[in-house]
């Protein structure tokens, strides 16, 4: 079985990612963001300096390549920040490639069934917890030689697997999804969920509130973590009160736009 409290055999960066996963299972809150647009060499170091404990790199909406993702992960080496990747779809090649590139975790969008959750675990974890293919001495283990058994055990302890639940069907099945062994996080995709509910962007609507609470409860019962991200602190405050512990501020586009808008409005008031 996967031991979230196990000791990682890798370097400090790998150990930090393992520590993040351990903290999730210990019931602690973890804070970070998601990046859609500004994939520069300084992005992850800047977000780390700002206090992010994790960064999710988006491949669903951003259109970036695996080469860009691999570069971003390399820029994060040596920093105390976990780097997770949202892949565009649930396919073995999509999941395994970002892990081989060195990602500390994978988020899959539009996950709706327990069978899909089990597929994610199977694609992402090495035996005995999954069926991920073996390729050693590559980016994911920092190009170093080592004992394959130790590398696989370390990866299974470090990697965080995230189900992005953002449809009515996903909410209906969320208890079974979160019960899947090896799945760590249920992340609420609130805009897509309200869109599927026919109430796009209405986050105070009783149907959305009920769905958000249902996912939080499913995560609690399964011993997993409920996650949510937005640029609205009021929204995140409400999610935290519901039991969401993996919280994200942003994403990068929203934060940059809001920061410049606020500063320029203030500037125009006196200049």
Q: Where do the language-model regions lie?
A:
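Glycine-rich, proline-tolerant flexible connector loops at the mouths of alpha/beta enzymes
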Residues: 43-44, 52-70, 190-204
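Short, well-ordered coil/turn segments that N-cap beta-strands
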Residues: 26-31, 52-53, 77-83, 103-104, ...
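Short, acidic/polar
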Residues: 36-48, 89-97, 169-179, 231-236
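Active-site mouth loops of central-metabolism enzymes
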Residues: 26-39, 160-172, 225-230
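Alpha-helix-loop-beta-strand connector modules within alpha/beta enzyme cores
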Residues: 66-87, 92, 96, 125-129, ...
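Glycine-rich phosphate-binding active-site loops on the catalytic face of alpha/beta enzymes
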Residues: 107-116, 187-195, 245-262
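Conserved anion-binding
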Residues: 93, 105-181, 190-195
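N-terminal amphipathic alpha-helix/helix-capping segment at the start of soluble metabolic enzymes
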Residues: 10-34, 146-157
